[in-house]
């Protein structure tokens, strides 16, 4: 990126970047505070939430297959997962994970679909489950599609591509 590219950025680009950063920061805070009901309100009814399986390959283009996923959920399944995370019988999250999400390298792009903003970001999540011991670190790149309708912003689709091909965490019960 050159300085000229930055100086030629128009107000729409700056506005889009502000909207995306604000949305992602707010979402991270809700998830870190385990406010899952409020987080679900940020999701579009047509949400697709995808975490593809990553393979070891020499070529980047061959690291992800279109038919292999850790997670491939819609809103109904996300509601079930959120509810399970907030009850004591949800054994995958007992005790509940304490998390800290860092979202950065946010880049936005308008796409052909009316009112939809494509957002790329890099995310690091630190997760601690026990009172003592080492926590987990998950690093990944995300591509989100945000639907902007009037003053409302909703997450329409998320693809989170984990850096690790082999997970060093006991589960993916937390939301990426």
Curated annotation (Swiss-Prot):
Protein name in UniProt: N,N-dimethyl phenylurea N-demethylase subunit beta
EC number, as in UniProt: 1.14.15.38
Enzyme class: oxidoreductase
Activity regulation information from UniProt: Activity is stimulated in vitro by coexpression of a [3Fe-4S]-type ferredoxin.
Reaction catalysed by this enzyme: a 1,1-dimethyl-3-phenylurea + 2 reduced [2Fe-2S]-[ferredoxin] + O2 + 2 H(+) = a 1-methyl-3-phenylurea + formaldehyde + 2 oxidized [2Fe-2S]-[ferredoxin] + H2O; isoproturon + 2 reduced [2Fe-2S]-[ferredoxin] + O2 + 2 H(+) = 1-methyl-3-[4-(propan-2-yl)phenyl]urea + formaldehyde + 2 oxidized [2Fe-2S]-[ferredoxin] + H2O; chlorotoluron + 2 reduced [2Fe-2S]-[ferredoxin] + O2 + 2 H(+) = 3-(3-chloro-4-methylphenyl)-1-methylurea + formaldehyde + 2 oxidized [2Fe-2S]-[ferredoxin] + H2O; metoxuron + 2 reduced [2Fe-2S]-[ferredoxin] + O2 + 2 H(+) = 3-(3-chloro-4-methoxylphenyl)-1-methylurea + formaldehyde + 2 oxidized [2Fe-2S]-[ferredoxin] + H2O
UniProt keyword list: Oxidoreductase, Plasmid
Gene name per UniProt: pdmB
GO BP: 3-phenylpropionate catabolic process
InterPro entries in alphabetical order: NTF2-like_dom_sf, Rng_hydr_dOase-bsu
GO molecular function: oxidoreductase activity
Quaternary state and interactors: PdmA (subunit alpha) and PdmB (subunit beta) form the oxygenase component of a bacterial Rieske non-heme iron oxygenase (RO) system.
Family per record: Belongs to the bacterial ring-hydroxylating dioxygenase beta subunit family.
């Amino acid at each position: 990126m050159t300085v000229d590219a930055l100086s030629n950025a128009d107000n729409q680009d700056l506005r889009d970047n502000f909207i995306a950063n604000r949305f992602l920061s707010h979402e991270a805070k809700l998830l870190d505070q385990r406010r899952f009901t409020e987080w679900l309100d940020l999701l579009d009814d047509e949400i697709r939430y995808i975490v593809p399986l990553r393979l070891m390959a020499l070529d980047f283009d061959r690291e992800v297959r279109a038919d292999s996923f850790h997670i491939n959920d819609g809103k109904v399944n996300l509601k079930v997962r959120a509810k399970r995370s907030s009850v004591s019988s949800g054994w995958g999250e007992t005790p509940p994970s304490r998390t800290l999400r860092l979202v950065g390298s946010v880049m936005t792009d308008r796409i052909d679909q009316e009112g939809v903003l494509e957002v790329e970001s890099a995310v690091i999540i630190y997760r601690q489950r026990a009172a003592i011991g080492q926590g987990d670190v998950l690093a990944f790149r995300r591509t989100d599609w945000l639907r902007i309708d009037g003053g409302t912003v909703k997450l329409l689709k998320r693809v989170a591509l984990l850096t690790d091909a082999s997970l060093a965490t006991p589960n993916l019960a937390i939301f990426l």
